[in-house]
Amino acid sequence: MAKKSMIAKAKRKPKFKVRAYTRCSICGRVHSVYRDFGICRICLRKMANEGLLPGVKKASW
């Protein structure tokens, strides 16, 4: 329940712009969110492996 309330709180516009932070649009995770996709690293990897993100491929070197 605490996580849901924090997600709802993050959606509101903060009083000061500095207080705004990124959250994963799928799971609500705060840390390691990629701005380009708007999702966290865990969801990014899961979606990339399933082929749901166009243009993303596994790196090999």
UniProtKB/Swiss-Prot annotation:
Keywords carried by this UniProt record: Metal-binding, Ribonucleoprotein, Ribosomal protein, RNA-binding, rRNA-binding, Zinc
Domain of life, source organism: Bacteria
Binding-site residues for Zn(2+), renumbered to this chain: 24, 27, 40, 43
Cofactor note: Binds 1 zinc ion per subunit.
Cellular component terms (Gene Ontology): cytoplasm; small ribosomal subunit
Signal sequence bounds: none
A Pfam cross-reference name: Ribosomal_S14
Entry cofactors: Zn(2+)
GO molecular function: rRNA binding; structural constituent of ribosome; zinc ion binding
Transmembrane segments: none
GO biological process, one term: translation
InterPro entries: Ribosomal_uS14, Ribosomal_uS14_bact, Ribosomal_uS14_CS, Ribosomal_uS14_sf
Family, similarity comment: Belongs to the universal ribosomal protein uS14 family. Zinc-binding uS14 subfamily.
Subunit structure: Part of the 30S ribosomal subunit. Contacts proteins S3 and S10.
Functional description taken from the UniProt entry: Binds 16S rRNA, required for the assembly of 30S particles and may also be responsible for determining the conformation of the 16S rRNA at the A site.
Protein name per Swiss-Prot or TrEMBL: Small ribosomal subunit protein uS14
Taxonomic source organism: Nautilia profundicola (strain ATCC BAA-1463 / DSM 18972 / AmH)
Taxonomic lineage: Bacteria, Pseudomonadati, Campylobacterota, Epsilonproteobacteria, Nautiliales
